[in-house]
C-alpha cells in the first residue's frame, strides 16, 4: 500500500496530509487559502493521487507559511509513500495547455531535490493570493519530496491560467513517475541500486 500520513506543527502552522498514490484523484483540501486549495485540487485530480490536506496558519500575517509548510508536508508524504521506489517509472513529463498558457514539466523522483522554475506570473496577486507563493510551494515540495523538478512556461498572459497550467503539468508528470512499471517488477529504477 503506497500511502502516507504526515503531520507538521510549528509556531506558525499546523498541517496534516494524507495521500494514496494508487488512488483515483479524490481530494479534500482545506488550507484556508482559497486559490491554493483550488490548485491542490488540480494536483490531486490530475495526478490520480488521493489527497486530504488540512492546514491552519498564521493568516493574520499572510499565506506564506501555510503554503510553504503544506509543500514541505506534501513532499514528505510523497517520499514516505514511495518508500524505496521499487518498480516505479521514476520519470514523468507533460506539456499542459490551458487557454493562453502552456507549461512544460519534466521531473525525476531521483532523491536529489532541485527546482528549475522558468515561470513569469504577470500579476502580483490572483484574487488575494500572492503569486510568488506558487514557486515557494514547488520549492518546498520538490526539496522535501526529493524531486528534480523543471517547470517552464512556454506561453501565457493570464496569471490564473499560467499557475493552474503549472499545477496540472506537475500533476500529469507526477502521475507518470509514480506509476508502477510492470516491466520493472520490483527493481529500483537506477543502476546505482538505490534512489
Curated annotation (Swiss-Prot):
Pathway: Amino-acid biosynthesis; L-histidine biosynthesis; L-histidine from 5-phospho-alpha-D-ribose 1-diphosphate: step 6/9. Its main location: cytoplasm. One of its GO terms (cellular component) is cytoplasm. Transmembrane segments: none annotated. InterPro entries: IGPD_sf (IPR038494), ImidazoleglycerolP_deHydtase (IPR000807), ImidazoleglycerP_deHydtase_CS (IPR020565), Ribosomal_Su5_D2-typ_SF (IPR020568). It catalyses: D-erythro-1-(imidazol-4-yl)glycerol 3-phosphate = 3-(imidazol-4-yl)-2-oxopropyl phosphate + H2O. GO terms for molecular function: imidazoleglycerol-phosphate dehydratase activity. It comes from the Bacteria. Keywords: Amino-acid biosynthesis, Cytoplasm, Histidine biosynthesis, Lyase. It is found in: Cytoplasm. Disulfide bonds: none annotated. GO terms for biological process: L-histidine biosynthetic process. Its EC number is 4.2.1.19. SUPFAM superfamilies: Ribosomal protein S5 domain 2-like. NCBIfam families: PRK00951.1-5, PRK00951.2-1, PRK00951.2-4. Belongs to the imidazoleglycerol-phosphate dehydratase family. This is Imidazoleglycerol-phosphate dehydratase. It comes from Ruegeria pomeroyi (strain ATCC 700808 / DSM 15171 / DSS-3). The gene is hisB.
